[in-house]
Each structure stands twice: as C-alpha cells, then as structure tokens.
A protein has these predicted regions:
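Short loop segments at secondary-structure junctions
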Residues: 31, 52-54, 63, 126-130, ...
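Acidic, metal-coordinating catalytic segment for phosphate/diphosphate chemistry
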Residues: 11-47, 53
Length: 181
C-alpha cells in the first residue's frame, strides 16, 4: 500500500490494538530514510469555555488516572459517532456542569500531533442556563464543578495550579481576546 500525503509516502500501516482507541504503526519515508511510528487514533473532541454574566468561568475538577491526580479543566469530551462538534459540546456541557447556553465556535487544535489524531473543537458558552434535564456523567467521571473569576483562572494557569494543556490554551485564548464576552 503506497499513499502519498503531504509529499510523504506512506509505505504501510498495521493495527496494533483496537478498543476505545486504536493504535496503529505507520511506516513511511522521511527523506531517504524509512521511519516507523506508532499512532493513536482517538475520536475528535470538544472543549467548552463556559462564561457566566459575572465574568466567571465554569471549570471541573476530576481525578485522571493517567496522571494519578485531580486536575482542574474546562468541560470537555469526545465527539460520539453521528454527532457534530456543536452537538457534542451541548451534551458535554449538560453532563459535566449541568448547563445549557449559546455556543460560539472559537478555534480548533490537535492535542498531541506527534502521535495522536485527536482534534479538539473549542466553543465559548454564554447565556448560561441550568439544564432542565441533566444528563448522567460517564461511569469513569466524578466531577466537582468550580466557578471562578476568569482572571483567577488565568493566574492558576500561570502559577501552575492548572496544568491541563487544553484548559491552559482555552483560558489563555479567551483572556487575551479583544472581543468583549
């Protein structure tokens, strides 16, 4: 199998694992060398920057087994099959923080492009309202909702109290935006 991508020739790909994620090994030319790289295929995801009318951001704190720590994060989650990014953002906002609101697309980025296919779509959620029917959290989630001033959230990013990269990117982006939210 030869596939030409961005002036790179992919010689082959083989699946190493398949479950909630897939791990594959791609073999390709890099200049005159043949390189093999393991790639995680992960569904795309959404991140929500939920701001209330008092200048607070709604964050979540949850234990993350991979880090063996509780992290402070923006509400986020994977896009399920058949969902648009906006549908997923509405669902995740309801599940994780119990709110609905107006969603505005902000930006997209790859989270770990050196080895992972996941792209995250970020949304601003404004005009927040308590959800009439709150969805159940995922079975691996135990979430505490935190509402703090956006300026305090930025300070927590700078001081190292917030260490989740998607959250740092989102808070930095919204804090440095010239648009009045």
């Amino acid at each position: 199998m030869l596939i030409k991508m961005d002036e790179r020739i992919i010689l082959g790909s083989r699946k190493l694992y398949s479950g909630n994620i897939t791990v594959r090994s791609d073999k390709y030319y890099l200049g005159d060398k043949v390189v093999e790289k393991e790639i995680v295929e992960h569904p795309d995801s959404v991140g929500i920057i939920a701001l209330d009318n008092k200048g607070n951001i709604v964050l979540v704190e949850q234990f993350r087994i991979a880090t063996k720590n509780s992290l402070i994060e923006i509400p986020a989650g994977k896009i399920e099959k058949g969902e648009t990014p906006e549908d997923a953002a509405r669902r995740e906002m309801n599940e994780e923080i119990g709110y609905s609101g107006k969603l505005t697309p902000l930006f997209q980025c790859y989270l770990a492009p050196g080895y992972d296919t996941e792209k995250m779509y970020f949304f601003l959620a404004s005009n927040l309202k308590i959800s009439k029917k709150r969805l159940t959290q995922d079975e691996d989630e135990e979430i505490k909702v935190k509402r703090i001033k956006l300026s305090s959230a930025l300070e927590k990013c700078i001081s190292g109290k917030i260490i989740d990269c998607k959250t740092i990117a989102a808070i930095t982006m919204i804090s440095n935006s010239k648009i009045n939210w």
